[in-house]
């Protein structure tokens, strides 16, 4: 899909949730990417200001043309959305009217082979959104077998995680695994493609490594709490997710913050008592794409939108249960052989 335009998913639904056009305000686009949401937000309301954040310096550089054209209505900042409250305050804004988060990897990252996110075109095994720190190649070539199995099982939900980890170790003993194509071939040797699914055997393993390299679930956890701290009463938080690990964290956050106890489960070892409601639910469950959008934009098919409206209750302490969801739980180690 290289060269295809980026289409923001569930755009009409996000615009409706954020109630654009109801007067001047400030909205945070915590995941700028190719600028799809920011561009749509600016076009929908001439009185709106947008503070857009992206940890990827390439995305920030590419967005400067849009920022210049917005005439001061768009402020584009390089940073992590987990720090969005601090970033917003550094911009001289104490509270905002809306926050939108589109979680996960962007199409502009997937489409560039040199970024090393995708198995669809061979490139260096990198996956770093910021271009610094531990790369996927570092992890694949340096992590112990058990750690690789844990990462692939929990963050990729790959049932064959032990077999994949074992195959990676056998391959790296012969030579370092340096490219996305090499890793995809190793995984395809032990994971069978599901007939008729159209899903590449390496999909779950690549997802797991990307999440681990960029601490994506930890960032999501921090971003939800940061949004809670920076939204004014009546402000709204809209979060679009693309797989069950992300959606589970968002669902538990809104459940707990809307007055429901976070119940114990195999993912949440301890229940947490309800706290004063900091959010009311805007969406009573996940909102998915229309049939027309799913047909026009394949990326939208797995998208889910959840949203909440901030109350005037003080922001409580961060939920320990969400931090547990974002980490590797010891009892989920290994997966099946």
UniProtKB/Swiss-Prot annotation:
Main location: cytoplasm
Repressor found in the keyword field: no
Compartmental location: Cytoplasm
Residues reported to bind S-adenosyl-L-methionine: 35-37, 54, 81, 102, 109
GO molecular function annotations of the record: rRNA (cytosine-N4-)-methyltransferase activity
Positions of the UniProt region annotated as Disordered: 286-316
Entry keyword set: Cytoplasm, Methyltransferase, rRNA processing, S-adenosyl-L-methionine, Transferase
Superkingdom to which the source organism belongs: Bacteria
Catalytic activity: cytidine(1402) in 16S rRNA + S-adenosyl-L-methionine = N(4)-methylcytidine(1402) in 16S rRNA + S-adenosyl-L-homocysteine + H(+)
Function in brief: Specifically methylates the N4 position of cytidine in position 1402 (C1402) of 16S rRNA.
Name the record gives this protein: Ribosomal RNA small subunit methyltransferase H
Organism encoding this protein: Methylobacterium sp. (strain 4-46)
Phylogenetic placement of the source organism: Bacteria, Pseudomonadati, Pseudomonadota, Alphaproteobacteria, Hyphomicrobiales
Gene: rsmH
